[in-house]
């Protein structure tokens, strides 16, 4: 399953920042604050002009491609797990964007066998508007796709300085790092997610932020946010948002 593979990747050799000194913790917090400044970016086409973290895999003439993803996952007690979200590949060389809307259903039978069903609907973006590239007969689904909003378009972290007592971790070998905070139900982003995705649980949510690259770097590399409301063997409600900067694929560099 895709999400299990992601979890495996995330579980790497992590070094607690407490053993690295206050300076490293400060660098990580400053880097996350830098990343959070892109929220909100209402016009996604602004990413065509944003620089990202570049490693040795980038060709010198490649401006890179932004990969933006937002996905909501819900699993009520006794029900199957359903994820709905969208992925965009924003090529800075061609200033063009393609992607897909994805619906994933995950169920588990009495023998503990897992069935993963996934449907993708290709899309493109023109003038900041999402357009399906194949005919969709289901009008409700078509409206979901055309009116989809990424978290980066409405999320805001202007009060991120209020996040206190976070768990900070750093792996210098990857390099990657993370920070986890417990949020209140009065948090702006939590209110936005509850309204947009009809989240009824009143359990206190937490925010996990992950990043890759040098924390001292001036550009955004890989960044992942996860807002978890409930996550256990019986019930799951969580939202993930990621911004990733990759080398462009194909010949249109």
Swiss-Prot record:
Q: Where is the signal peptide?
A: 1-19
Q: Which domain of life is it from?
A: Bacteria
Which PROSITE patterns does this UniProt record tie to the protein?
PROKAR_LIPOPROTEIN (PS51257)
Kindly state which keywords UniProt assigns to this record, in alphabetical order.
Cell membrane, Lipoprotein, Membrane, Palmitate, Signal
Give the residues carrying a lipid (S-diacylglycerol cysteine): 20
Task: Extract the InterPro entries matched here.
Answer: Csa (IPR007595), Csa_sf (IPR038641)
Chain residues carrying a lipid of type N-palmitoyl cysteine: 20
Q: Name one Pfam family in it.
A: DUF576
Subcellular location per the Swiss-Prot or TrEMBL entry: Cell membrane
Q: Member of which family?
A: Belongs to the staphylococcal tandem lipoprotein family.
Could you identify this protein by its name? Uncharacterized lipoprotein SERP2447
Source organism of this protein record: Staphylococcus epidermidis (strain ATCC 35984 / DSM 28319 / BCRC 17069 / CCUG 31568 / BM 3577 / RP62A)
């Amino acid at each position: 399953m895709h999400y299990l593979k992601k979890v495996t990747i995330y579980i790497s050799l992590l070094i607690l920042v407490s053993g690295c000194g206050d300076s490293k913790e400060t660098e990580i917090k400053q880097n996350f604050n830098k990343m959070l400044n892109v929220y909100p970016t209402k016009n996604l086409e602004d990413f065509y002009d944003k620089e990202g973290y570049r490693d040795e895999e980038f060709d010198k003439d490649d401006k890179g491609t932004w990969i933006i993803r937002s996905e909501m996952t819900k699993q009520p007690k006794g029900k199957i797990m359903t994820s709905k979200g969208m992925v965009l590949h924003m090529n800075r060389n061609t200033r063009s964007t393609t992607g897909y809307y994805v619906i994933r259903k995950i169920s588990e039978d009495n023998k503990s066998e897992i069935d993963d069903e996934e449907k993708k609907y290709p899309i493109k973006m023109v003038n900041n508007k999402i357009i399906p590239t194949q005919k969709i007969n289901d009008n409700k689904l078509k409206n979901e796709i055309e009116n989809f909003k990424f978290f980066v378009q409405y999320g805001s972290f202007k009060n991120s300085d209020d996040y206190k007592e976070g768990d900070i971790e750093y792996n210098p070998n990857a390099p990657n790092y993370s920070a986890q905070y417990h949020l209140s139900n009065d948090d702006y982003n939590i209110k936005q997610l509850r309204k947009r995705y009809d989240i009824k649980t009143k359990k206190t949510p937490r925010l996990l932020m992950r990043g890759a690259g040098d924390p001292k770097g001036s550009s955004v590399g890989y960044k992942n946010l996860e807002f978890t409301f409930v996550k256990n063997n019986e019930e799951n409600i969580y939202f993930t948002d990621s911004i990733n900067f990759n080398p462009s694929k194909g010949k249109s560099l």
